């Protein structure tokens, strides 16, 4: 199959029929240049699924070096307004009453039968503003439905944000070479603002792997190519490679996937 991206043709066994219903990311062209061998689709957006010849080769590189991952498919659901805390509380058994600004929570979302519908990372940006960095389901529609049904005073949107992950034991040295020594003080599952090309961008110490790593919540599609190239050039010193969620690494870390593989609607958070 030929997958076309703005003049770039990529032979793939992914089985995808490309259309406007499948969204590209700011990094898609760089991902193709880096040698991606296939894609899957999460939240209606492309997610690279393989680069290396084997998953074992990818695992050993990830556990010893650093990788750059296009995880733009982690769409953000922004909930803002005077009732934002009330709505976010309603969607999960985990309380956010004492959640500080700048913190990330693993946040299992449940339906009316307490079944799992998503397991996002929750970020608190201000007293009345939250981001849900979601796995593969339509959380935006679920949140809007609850807000309308409860007559809550909130504004719910999908912001122009495209996460890029830097994972692996050398990720801290790589990131500090670009964003400064301040980033070394960032604790696990916390975030802060860092400057890039004259803009303020959120970076969290988190990621899909059990390795040390960071996620850059890039605001602005147009900055994607520059961000990738900046990290790639700086990363050559640290044996950087393109990557994607690795099944061996995730199983070792006890990191389950929503997407109806390990966790689905009949699954309760206490199981």
Region spans (language model):
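Conserved adenylation A10 loop of the ANL superfamily
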Residues: 70, 209, 263
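Single conserved hydrophobic/aromatic residue that forms the stacking wall/gate
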Residues: 261-271
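Acidic, low-complexity central loop/insert segments
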Residues: 118-257
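Acidic, proline/glycine-enriched N-terminal capping motif
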Residues: 2-107, 115
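Ser/Thr-centric signal marking residues that sit
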Residues: 25, 209, 267-268
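Short acidic-hydrophobic surface loop/beta-edge motif
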Residues: 38-40, 107-110, 189-197
């Amino acid at each position: 199959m030929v997958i076309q991206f703005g003049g770039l043709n990529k032979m793939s066994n992914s089985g995808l029929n490309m259309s406007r219903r499948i969204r590209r990311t700011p990094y898609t062209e760089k991902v193709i240049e880096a040698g991606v061998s296939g894609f899957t689709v999460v939240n209606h957006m492309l997610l690279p699924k393989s680069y290396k010849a084997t998953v074992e080769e990818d695992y050993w590189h990830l556990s010893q070096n650093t990788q750059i991952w296009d995880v733009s498919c982690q769409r953000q659901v922004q909930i803002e307004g005077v009732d934002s805390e009330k709505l976010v509380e309603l969607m999960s058994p985990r309380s956010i009453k004492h959640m500080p600004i700048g913190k990330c929570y693993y946040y299992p979302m449940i339906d009316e039968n307490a079944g799992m519908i998503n397991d996002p990372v929750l970020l608190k940006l201000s007293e009345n503003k939250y981001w849900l960095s979601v796995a593969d389901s339509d959380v935006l529609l679920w949140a809007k439905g609850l807000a309308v049904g409860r007559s809550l005073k909130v504004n719910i949107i999908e912001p122009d944000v495209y996460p890029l992950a830097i994972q692996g034991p050398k990720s801290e040295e790589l990131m500090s070479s670009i964003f400064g020594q301040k980033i070394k003080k960032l604790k696990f599952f916390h975030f802060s603002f860092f400057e890039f090309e004259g803009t303020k961008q959120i970076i969290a110490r988190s990621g899909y792997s059990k390795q040390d790593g960071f996620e850059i919540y890039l605001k602005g599609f147009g900055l994607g190519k520059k961000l990738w190239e900046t990290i790639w050039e700086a990363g050559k010193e640290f044996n950087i490679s393109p990557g994607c969620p690795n099944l061996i690494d995730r199983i070792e870390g006890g990191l389950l996937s929503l997407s109806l593989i390990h966790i689905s609607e009949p699954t309760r958070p206490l199981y």
